[in-house]
């Protein structure tokens, strides 16, 4: 077997052990290493989009909620209480409501954190302004 050098990511943490091993038809073992990604690299790559999860969940939650309403309405229009389709409709309906509620909760927490940061920065500005004029 011949060993080929692997290309490593600069600045990224190195994977201590190979992650995936595949066998080719010629009885050769191909080792694929997957680099670990840090939170800083993720933020740099996504532009901070991982902190806006509540914005991504809203459209998905609305679609799931509407689907749940439709499936539940169809199931109960045929008087099939307790059937698989009615249970599926209720699960979709409750999942949509849960996703909408969690999105609203995340939005409220984020707004509260923004207010706190804004208040802290205003306090720091006022303190700096007083020290300049004192």
UniProtKB/Swiss-Prot annotation:
Per the entry, what this protein does is: Plays a role during embryonic arterial endothelium differentiation and vascular morphogenesis through the ACVRL1 receptor-dependent signaling pathway upon stimulation by bone morphogenetic proteins, such as GDF2/BMP9 and BMP10. Involved in the regulation of nociception, acting as a modulator of the interaction between TRPA1 and TRPV1, two molecular sensors and mediators of pain signals in dorsal root ganglia (DRG) neurons.
Q: Under what name is this protein listed?
A: Transmembrane protein 100
Assembly, in brief, is:
Interacts (via C-terminus) with TRPA1 and TRPV1. Interacts with TASOR.
Q: How does it sit in the membrane?
A: Multi-pass membrane protein
Pfam families linked to this entry: TMEM100
In its UniProt entry, the species of origin is given as Rattus norvegicus
Q: Where are the transmembrane segments?
A: 56-76, 84-104
**Which UniProt key words apply to this protein?**
Cell membrane, Cytoplasm, Developmental protein, Differentiation, Endoplasmic reticulum, Membrane, Phosphoprotein, Transmembrane, Transmembrane helix
Q: What is the lineage of its organism?
A: Eukaryota, Metazoa, Chordata, Craniata, Vertebrata
Localization per Swiss-Prot or TrEMBL: Cell membrane; Membrane; Perikaryon; Cytoplasm, Perinuclear region
Residues modified as Phosphoserine are 15, 121
Record keyword Endoplasmic reticulum present = yes
InterPro entries from the xrefs? TMEM100
């Amino acid at each position: 077997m011949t060993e080929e050098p692997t290309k490593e990511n600069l600045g990224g943490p190195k994977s201590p052990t190979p992650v995936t091993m595949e066998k080719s038809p010629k009885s050769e073992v191909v080792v694929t290493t997957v680099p670990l990604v840090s939170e800083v690299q993720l933020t740099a790559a996504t532009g901070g989009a991982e902190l806006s999860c509540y914005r991504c969940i809203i459209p998905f939650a609305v679609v799931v909620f509407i689907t749940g309403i439709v499936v539940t309405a169809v199931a109960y229009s045929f008087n099939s209480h307790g059937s698989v389709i009615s249970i599926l409709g209720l699960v979709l309906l409750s999942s949509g409501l849960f996703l909408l509620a969690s999105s609203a909760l995340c939005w409220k927490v984020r707004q509260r954190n923004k207010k706190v940061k804004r208040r802290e920065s205003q306090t720091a500005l006022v303190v700096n302004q007083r020290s300049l004029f004192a």
